Design a protein with these regions (language model features):
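Eukaryote-biased RCC1-like beta-propeller repeat architecture
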Residues: 2-486
Length: 486
């Protein structure tokens, strides 16, 4: 990789197969909210209260749009695996053809959009489906849909972008994809969910196994400004800095000081999961000798979810992490799981404060207030892991604009270039081409040289990007790229 520096300057701990049953009943009072519903903005005790959630949103005010609006429109580019059922698998599931969809080894334009410009893209490191929002506010979805995660009313796979009818009339300003579920955020601060709900990850207050039509999450607190999905849990952030979680609590992923396990019998274990959003009320600092101090007045401003962990930033540029601690992905120089958000001492302000965080499946990337990227966890399937945040030296001197994190791959838009890396096996999500499919060190994506990427998101084995197309010169370069059509 060409350097652009300033002159002054083990193996994933896989979760064992869970031989547990998921109980629909709320049987333990220890999981009740530590604050009342008015403060938490949640209906923590179940479906009856959830029914009181707002249904008519027409009178709700719009959230203030950022300068420039809800995302700058551009041309959608895509690379990676398009056989969605094969993502993360060596063999196709029973009844699924192995050759439906191919790998796009370099970035392609998407013919089926019919030249529609796109202002928002979303996927997730565990997801084999994607969300795209067009300039004229259509919410389009495509990819795997076996649990109804596309929200289109059925469970049929979509290769061609399909509009979500349930969201017509809404302006979608944010979205996130879990393994088999999806969250949509509208401009009025309302959250809709679809997909697998076996563990409550859709937050609709019901125990339905699948939610095939986009349905409003049972929440009635302050407007929501951001949504995020782990593999089997969800996070939403309100306008006042309150963070709420729901879904599977395994490894402490929900941040409620529990992993949700309980015994039904001497040999039978189950999980208590959260079916509606519940506020995270405790943030702590732990010293080297194990002393724990609660922190007051924490207002979260941003967050990112990995498969089973979350990293969040507060208004003081402090970073907190919790959930599964394997291979150092939480940045605390140890592998213990954290059941509540814990301050990352290695990223403490003022000299080391954080302005952005991005989580992959088993790793995290923080961009500090000086613009340097630091990684903790493990992007490779083997080898040494970063137990605490360490600078990514190959990105030193680049002005990082946006980051996409996949299972083991990372794609970064910086200055007028795109930089990517990821260990084998890869399926084209890095965009290097068929001759060199992977790289364990950051490399520039030559196919995008001279193009300005404004947004990046990564799925399990694919990457979406929005490319600026304001000038004739930029459009001419885009037209030279290969075209993907279904």
């Amino acid at each position: 990789m060409s350097t652009k520096r300033k002159n002054t300057g083990g193996k994933k701990n896989r979760a064992k197969s869970r031989k547990v049953e998921y109980d629909d009943e709320d049987i333990s009072s220890e999981h009740n909210s530590e604050v009342d519903d008015a403060e938490a903005g949640s209906n923590a005790d179940g479906e009856d209260a959830a029914e009181d959630a707002l249904t008519d949103v027409s009178d709700m005010p719009e959230l203030p749009a950022p300068e420039g609006g809800w995302g700058k429109p551009g041309t959608l580019l895509m690379c990676g695996l398009t056989n969605w059922e094969m993502a993360g698998r060596k063999a196709p599931p029973k009844g699924i053809k192995a050759n439906v969809g191919r790998s796009l080894w370099t970035p392609h334009t998407f013919k089926n959009l019919n030249n529609a410009r796109v202002r928002l893209i979303a996927s997730g490191p565990a997801a084999s489906h994607s969300i795209i929002i067009t300039e004229d506010n259509r919410c389009l979805v495509f990819g795997k849909n076996d649990k109804g995660q596309l929200g289109v009313g059925d469970s049929k796979r979509r290769d061609e972008p399909t509009e979500v009818e349930a969201l017509k009339g809404h302006t979608v300003i944010g979205a996130s994809c879990g393994r088999n579920h999806t969250l949509f955020l509208t401009s009025r601060g309302i959250v809709f969910a679809a997909g697998d709900n076996k563990l409550g990850q859709c937050g609709v207050g019901k125990s339905d196994a699948c939610i095939v039509t986009a349905t409003k999450v049972k929440y009635s607190g302050p407007p929501i400004v951001k949504v995020g999905c782990g593999a089997e849990f969800s996070m939403i952030l309100d306008i006042k800095g309150g963070l709420y979680s729901f879904g599977c609590p395994e490894y402490g992923a929900l941040g409620h000081n529990t992993d949700g396990k309980y015994f039904i019998t001497n040999t039978k274990m189950a999980f208590h999961y959260e079916k509606v959003p519940k506020r995270i009320v405790l943030y702590v600092e732990r010293t080297k000798d194990g002393h724990v101090t609660p922190l007051d007045r924490v207002e979260i401003t941003d967050f990112s979810c990995g498969h089973y962990h979350t990293v969040a930033i507060d208004s003081k540029s402090r970073a907190f992490s919790w959930g599964f601690g394997g291979v150092g992905r939480l940045g605390h120089n140890e592998q213990r799981d954290e059941l509540v958000p814990r301050l990352i001492k290695f990223l403490e302000p003022p000299s080391r404060g954080v302005r952005a965080v991005h989580c992959g499946s088993t790793y995290s990337i923080a961009i500090n207030v000086h613009g340097f990227a630091l990684m903790f966890g493990q992007t490779k399937r083997t080898g040494e892991a970063n137990m605490y945040p360490k600078p990514i030296q190959d990105l030193s001197g680049w002005e990082i604009r946006c980051v996409g994190c996949s299972q083991t791959s990372v794609v970064v838009a910086a200055d007028d270039s795109v930089i990517a890396w990821g260990a084998s096996p890869t399926f084209g999500e890095l965009g290097f081409g068929e001759m060199r499919k992977s790289s364990t060190t950051p490399m520039e994506v030559k196919a995008l040289e001279g193009l300005y990427i404004t947004a990046v998101t990564c799925g399990l084995s694919h990457t979406l990007m929005i490319c600026r197309d304001d000038t004739e010169e930029e459009r001419a370069k885009i037209n030279k790229l290969q075209v993907y059509s279904v």
